């Protein structure tokens, strides 16, 4: 959340009291929350692009994500964003998420192979 001047706002802790809830003991980690959602989408996009060949090019995934889900265009789309992060970091994070919260975050085999070769989506597809 941002105020009218564009300054990022912090989570209002009084919300917990208003809802009759206790304050969480673990700190809120915005990056973790964002990455968990983005990397899960990316894992599925890899399956659509590489494994199932539903789309032929990384830019088709990006266009669909920007136009269909509102993925931020300034990031270049989901696959371009993934290229900027790197497949190794993405697979490492997905493996950590799989350990923490379950197998639905297990990286696609094709993504792990790309990470082993440090490949980029826009170079390969």
How would you label these PLM feature ranges?
Residues 1-125:
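N-terminal glycine-rich phosphate-binding loop for ADP-containing cofactors
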């Amino acid at each position: 959340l941002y105020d009218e001047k564009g300054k990022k706002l912090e989570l209002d802790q009084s919300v917990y009291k208003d809802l009759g809830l206790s304050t969480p003991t673990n700190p809120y980690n915005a990056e973790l929350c964002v990455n968990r959602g983005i990397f899960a989408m990316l894992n599925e996009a890899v399956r659509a692009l590489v494994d199932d060949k539903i789309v032929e090019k990384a830019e088709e995934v990006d266009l669909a994500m920007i136009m269909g889900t509102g993925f931020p265009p300034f990031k270049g789309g989901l696959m371009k964003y993934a290229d900027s992060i790197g497949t190794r970091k993405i697979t490492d994070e997905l493996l950590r998420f799989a350990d923490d919260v379950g197998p639905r975050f297990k990286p696609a085999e094709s993504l792990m192979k790309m990470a082993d070769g440090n490949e980029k989506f826009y170079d390969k597809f």
